[in-house]
């Protein structure tokens, strides 16, 4: 029965939200699914389920009911309903602080620019006849304030721009890799490594997860092409050795210095070897450079099916 009062609507939404939670859906996944369930259950076929229109009609009319679904989730869960479409982030050091540069999710091409005016975010939606999508790089730096942005020198803005450009290609390469189950694991390791590095006190975890990401990317590339790779013993986790195999079998020459910096011994993982911020950041930067080189080799521009 269609609710006709706020009390009836609240009771319906609490019950529906509990049902969706029991199915394992997180807060960000529930608004659209809730709107679909309400539409199907109450026979509201043909009514837009996304809301957003200012013309909602009468209270508890079909359009108003579905708009209330989104209102209810926004009021109840707030930012937890927001979906983060970013493919990933890179970390840089500036003025002694670690900063996260979160990459935007872009469908198609876009133009990058950098401006200390953070209100100038760019044009994020391109329509026919309109300028192409544009993005202010400083708006990707998490926690950047207008006051801090205005203090940046020209060289510092160029540093940020360079890290964004190379980091974007690296992150998109990792995000687009297909054809081996290791790639999904590598993406998780990468996110964990960035999160750990940004905390400032999980540095051993950051280094280990960085090495795990590199190891699984390299093994995934080898395995995808049918080449053998070590699975146990010292060479099973030897990043430099895996780099040699990638060069031998795939013709991609990865810098030995970067492979060595990314490599991490089990002693780090188990807390037997102390890690510093400098070591963890150096490993992260080396991994980003390796992923950038793999992007230039176009290892992600294939039509491999998901495993």
Predicted regions mapped to residue ranges:
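Long, charged low-complexity segments
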Residues: 2-181, 222-307
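Short, contiguous, well-structured surface segments enriched in hydrophobic/aromatic residues
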Residues: 176-193
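Short helix-adjacent coil turns
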Residues: 181, 200-201
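Amphipathic alpha-helix face/heptad-repeat signature
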Residues: 182, 206-210, 257
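Generic structural signal for well-ordered, non-transmembrane alpha-helical segments
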Residues: 184, 191, 211-212, 288, ...
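Short, hydrophobic, well-ordered secondary-structure elements
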Residues: 187, 193-194, 201-225
């Amino acid at each position: 029965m269609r609710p006709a009062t706020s009390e009836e609507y609240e009771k319906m939404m609490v019950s529906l939200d509990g049902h969706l939670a029991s199915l394992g859906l997180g807060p960000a996944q529930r608004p659209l699914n809730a709107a679909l369930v309400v539409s199907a259950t109450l026979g509201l076929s043909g009514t837009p389920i996304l809301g957003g229109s200012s013309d909602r009609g009468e209270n508890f009319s079909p359009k108003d009911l579905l708009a209330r679904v989104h209102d209810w989730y926004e009021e109840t869960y707030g930012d937890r309903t927001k979906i983060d479409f970013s493919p990933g982030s890179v970390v840089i050091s500036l003025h002694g602080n670690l900063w996260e540069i979160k990459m935007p999710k872009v469908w198609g091409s876009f133009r990058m620019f950098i401006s200390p005016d953070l209100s100038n975010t760019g044009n994020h939606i391109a329509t026919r006849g309109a300028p192409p999508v544009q993005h202010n790089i400083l708006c990707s730096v998490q926690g950047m304030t207008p006051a801090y942005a205005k203090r940046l020198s020209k060289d510092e803005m160029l540093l940020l721009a360079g890290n964004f450009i190379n980091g974007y290609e690296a992150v998109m390469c990792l995000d687009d890799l297909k054809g081996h189950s290791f790639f999904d694991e590598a993406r998780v390791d990468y996110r964990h490594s960035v999160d750990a590095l940004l905390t400032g006190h999980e540095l051993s975890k950051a280094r280990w997860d960085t090495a795990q990401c590199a190891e699984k990317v390299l093994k995934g590339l080898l395995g995808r092409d049918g080449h053998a790779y070590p699975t146990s013993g010292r060479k099973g986790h030897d990043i430099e050795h895996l780099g040699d195999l990638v060069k031998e079998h795939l013709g991609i020459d990865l810098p030995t210095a970067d492979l060595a910096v990314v490599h991490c011994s089990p002693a780090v993982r188990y807390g037997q070897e102390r890690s510093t911020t400098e070591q963890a950041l150096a490993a992260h930067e080396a991994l980003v450079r390796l992923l950038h080189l793999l992007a230039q080799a176009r290892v992600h521009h294939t039509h491999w099916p998901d495993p």
